[in-house]
Regions:
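Extracellular, repeat-based ectodomains that mediate carbohydrate processing or recognition
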Residues: 1-167
């Protein structure tokens, strides 16, 4: 996916759009949107990856206000799977932490998907086409990953992950 959007579960009327900007070298951009009544307004575009970006996924942490994680393939870094923590402050101000590589095998992170644990702050699960899964941990503005675990020996095409809200 080259554009994803999600509502912020912690702030009424706020959502985030993450996309690649094909007019600017396919760089990765994020934009906060706000819905008020029947009107939509947007903040400024913020770049999280200046190089060629694709296969985006994004999720808000339902337990930590204003925090989200974006994952993507970074073609400006040999196509590695990369993650970055974002924060929203005020109405539309987005800041990003440092980028973290979660899979250094180029072309193995197509179609990744992430989901935060619904009852544990700062923890999420990431799966990707390589048939691998990781647990991600957000600390401040950085993210770290557990060693990857294989969940299928084949190619896991369009993987999607959801977290069990009862655990």
């Amino acid at each position: 996916n080259d554009i994803v959007a999600a509502y912020d579960p912690n702030t009424a009327g706020r959502f985030l759009v993450v996309c690649k900007d094909e007019a600017n070298g396919s760089s990765g951009k994020a934009i906060v949107g706000n819905v008020t009544g029947t009107s939509i307004s947007f903040g400024p575009e913020v770049t999280f990856n200046a190089g060629s970006t694709s296969y985006l996924a994004m999720s808000f942490d339902p337990n930590t206000a204003d925090k989200f994680v974006v994952t993507y393939m970074d073609w400006s870094n040999s196509g590695v799977g990369t993650a970055v923590v974002g924060s929203i402050s005020g109405t539309n101000v987005i800041t990003f932490g440092a980028k973290t590589v979660f899979n250094a095998g180029a072309n193995l992170t197509y179609r990744n998907s992430i989901a935060f644990y619904p009852n544990t702050a700062n923890k999420f699960i990431l799966v990707h086409q390589g048939g691998k899964a990781h647990i991600g941990t957000v600390t401040g503005t950085s993210v770290s990953f557990s060693p990857e675990v294989t969940f299928t020996a084949g190619t896991a095409g369009y993987s999607r992950i959801v977290a069990d809200p009862y655990t």
